[in-house]
Amino acid sequence: MACDEALYRQYLNGDDAGLEALMKKYGDPLTLYIDGYLHDVHEAEELMLDVFAYLFTKKPKIRDGGFKAYLYKAARHMALRHKSKRKPLFSLDALTSEPDGRLLAEEVIRTEERNRILHFCMDEMNPDYREVLYLTYFEDMSYAQAAEVTGKTVKQITNMVYRGKESLRRLLEREGITNAES
């Protein structure tokens, strides 16, 4: 598979296949990242498209190995700007979700409860800790990439990941989840 920067250069040279490959690779993860700020997946999808539109109309120069960090940094800035401008709305998505018929009812309930507790604990955390844990664990970014996205140093990211894991562990234990490992 071609590296991100090669796909970006391919697009800059006029081949839309590079754009399609980058959107396919980063569309869903970037939407989830933005949704972490907005808590509205539909708005997050729109902002994800705006991030790509900005990137591909402005065509900034991106250093080798820095495409993913640049993309997430742009998404973070757009999400924060959008969040500061919008008013809270009621979401129909929050009402209910239908369980998957293939799973046993107990397993569905247990999984939903675990997810609810995890989301509750993540929401209780310091937002900076939550963000670096998301970037390093869910987006599989290196500490250097997470530092570039957040505007912090690698040392600060290292400390924040450690403190974030400790904070999450304490919150999970408070909610009765005692097998939380680092």
Predicted features, each with a name:
Residues M1-P29, G36, D123, R170, ...:
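N-terminal module of bacterial RNA polymerase sigma factors
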Residues L12-N13, H39, L49-G66, K85-K87:
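Sigma70-family region 2
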Residues G27, T31, F52, N126, ...:
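C-terminal flanking helix
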